Regions:
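Hydrophobic, small-residue-rich alpha-helical packing segments that form membrane-like cores
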Residues: 196-197
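Auxiliary tRNA-acceptor-end handling modules of aminoacyl-tRNA synthetases
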Residues: 1-164, 168-169, 174-179, 183
Length: 197
């Protein structure tokens, strides 16, 4: 009975850019005006805590058109914050028995073909680049690399569980309409860990 239109946006029919654009309305409704007002007040409070607003106010990160959408640039203040969070996480991971690893940003397509990424995840990957006649891809996730590291040397049951972790930069092709601050980006630092038993 009590409703409010909250926002509107454009969307492609069935999510396909080749189809016509439709107008999407977002709204909410409640049984009484008191609950509606309470909900709208909560939304206003959330806006004050929006990471995009805080990031700008505290000069932590920004996006630049020449760099490209979904590719955040971290300022010195933001980098200090990231470094502190990473140090805390690394401390916890070390205490949990994780070993740190590093993996490359580019990989031959063969690895992603074997891992199933090309069959099941290619629409979220950037197009390949040709290097000496071989397709290379920017990594969308760290898993296949970690599996390679685990398989690189023979393991005894005494070596298990084998724990590795990494702050790997991953790249995902997010469509422009899917990008949202730091929540949906095209380049991200992913804290990733794997346990082999």
């Amino acid at each position: 009975k009590h409703f409010k239109i909250l926002s509107s946006s454009a969307a492609y029919w069935r999510g396909d850019e080749k189809n016509q654009t439709l107008q999407r309305l977002y709204g909410t409704s409640f049984q009484n005006s008191k609950d509606l007002k309470k909900y709208l007040l909560m939304l206003e409070e959330q806006k004050k805590r929006d990471h995009r607003k805080i990031g700008k106010e505290l000069d932590l990160f920004f996006f630049d058109d020449e760099v490209g959408p979904g590719l955040p640039l971290w300022t010195p203040s933001g980098t200090v914050l990231i470094d502190e969070l990473e140090a805390l996480a690394k401390e916890k991971e070390t205490a949990g028995g994780y070993l740190r690893v590093r993996t490359p940003h580019l990989t031959k397509g063969d690895l992603f073909s074997k891992s199933g990424h090309l069959d099941h995840y290619m629409s979220s990957m950037f197009s390949p680049m040709d290097v000496d006649g071989i397709d290379y891809y920017m990594k969308p996730m760290n898993c296949p690399y970690h599996h390679k590291i685990f398989a690189n040397t023979p393991k005894s049951y005494r070596d298990l569980p084998y724990r590795i972790s990494e702050y790997g930069t991953c790249y995902r092709y997010e469509k422009s309409g899917e990008l949202f601050g730091l929540m949906r980006v095209r380049s991200m630092q992913m804290n990733d860990g794997h346990i082999y038993c």
